[in-house]
Amino acid sequence: PALSGAKNIKSLYAKAYKHPTETVTGVHKDPEQDATNLGVGKRHSECWDCHNPHQAQTGSHTVAGTGGNLIGKVLLGQWGVEPSWGTTAWVTASSYLKQVFTNTTGFKQYQLCMKCHSSYAFASTPPTGITDQAIELNPYNRGAHPVRAGLNSQTGSTTPKPLAATQVSAPWTARGTQTMSCSDCHDSDVASDPKGTHGSAAARLKKGTGIYWPTNASGVLYNLG
């Protein structure tokens, strides 16, 4: 019988788009302490790759605000990597520093994602259908989602760095200072489902009603003017 009060995570893996937790087996090694088992030909996603069953606690991250990219208690005990870049836009990180999540005040959710979704895992050759998030979140790019830091800290951006007030919706109104987590956009398409990047009916594991990218519902590219 199901454990009383437990989240039905398994149901999310029946959705069209999901991490390959049930479809790739026999690849994970315990323990995985670095990138040697994360690259092309070794791609996998076990529960343990994101959660430490001995240290995880109840509680997801707080959405929006200046601490919107901090991990939630569900990620305690896991590890990720912090990228370091040079001064050139649109290139991947030059190095990565391992981060072990011992608290919820000094570690960021993107660090967990970067350990598999960046050149840390696959060097200069991303797997088919995967992009290097260390390139896309490079602080010297002209723009980026405020995953690593608030937009006022996007070094390569020009003034005004944040979007205009008319271009954002709640809770993303603290323009320039607030940060966000990967799972703020990549989550189940059903709001009542358990939180996290487990599975979605929308491509690229997107959540909510704004599931159109790079075009809007009419098939037209977005215009921020």
What are the roles of these predicted feature ranges?
Residues 1-225:
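A motif-centric signal for short, conserved binding hotspots located
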